[in-house]
Regions:
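A structural boundary/capping signal
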Residues: 1-287
Length: 287
């Protein structure tokens, strides 16, 4: 009987973390994303580093601090004392999505900074959540007198007017340039809480776009593997992985993914014909 222990691969470990939405371990799942690039990464050490930051923060907290005081204390600690902020000099560096690098450099992109900030906020018993705002991830906190929306890239709170202005490029063209009050911009629709699974997916898609723009197909495929584990019915991800496999010359894997996409994709998908032609070409090549 073979009793030897085989450590899970990074993808198997990730799959175990994201298999259920009940008690989804957001911080651990996000920390594990770096294991494709840094296979020796100790995820538990990353979690421990965040716990140490929280312990330092909690020692500063007066016993009778209300929610607003806790929020101010958190922002002072995170953005001023520790100096976390956006990486404006190298925004598209993949390390901006890897928590161990963000903790070391104190620089990241909005969504990675938000994950760390939310972990600390929840440790202070603040009702904090992520917001999948178009083009720029936000965080929100529910206070007794209302909701505060914060840009984790800068630490600044945002007014309704500022949010409406940021939303304008994503509005239908006929509403662009119309005052927010006149157009009745549905801000509430864009300020809904982002589920942990959606946060991880957005981070992976950020990495996906970086690797695709650099034509780094090996790293792109590794990201696609995680996206398909995370979102097994996101058929477009099979298509994109299949196209990456085809670029790498992995015909069998490309055919499997592209045929899966064709089988499940809606008939009105605009690229059905193009993908079908590519499948035919790959079959001829493989045959």
């Amino acid at each position: 009987m073979d009793l030897s222990f085989h450590a899970p691969t990074p993808l198997q470990y990730f799959a175990s973390l994201v298999q259920s939405d009940d008690h989804f371990p957001l911080l651990e799942a996000v920390a594990s994303l770096a294991q494709d690039e840094y296979p020796e990464l100790d995820v538990e050490q990353v979690l421990g580093d965040v716990d140490q930051l929280l312990a330092r923060l909690q020692r500063r907290l007066p016993a009778d601090a209300g929610p607003l005081q806790r929020l101010r204390l958190l922002n002072q600690f995170f953005f001023v004392d520790l100096g976390f902020g956006g990486n404006v000099n190298d925004y598209y560096d993949p390390d901006n999505s890897y928590l161990q690098a963000v903790l070391r450099t104190r620089r990241g992109i909005p969504i990675s900074l938000a994950v760390l900030w939310m972990e600390l906020a929840q440790g202070l018993r603040l009702k904090a959540h992520g917001v999948g705002f178009p083009g720029h991830f936000m965080v929100k906190v529910q206070l007794p007198k209302g909701q505060v929306v914060i840009d984790p890239f800068t630490g600044h709170s945002l007014s309704r007017e500022a949010l409406s202005e940021r939303l304008e490029p994503f509005q239908p063209r006929q509403l662009q340039g119309v005052l927010a009050d006149d157009a009745d911009v549905p801000l509430g629709l864009y300020l809904q809480t982002a589920a942990p699974r959606d946060i991880v997916a957005r981070m992976l898609r950020n990495l996906k776009e970086i690797h695709r723009s650099q034509q780094d197909w090996g790293r792109l495929i590794a990201v696609q593997d995680r996206l398909i584990v995370l979102l097994p019915e996101a058929w477009a991800e099979y298509r994109d992985r299949g196209l990456a496999y085809a670029t790498q010359g992995h015909t069998a894997q490309a055919l499997t993914d592209l045929e899966t996409y064709l089988h499940h994709a809606a008939f009105e998908a605009l690229d059905i014909g193009t993908i079908a032609e590519q499948v035919d070409a790959l079959r001829r090549k493989g045959g």
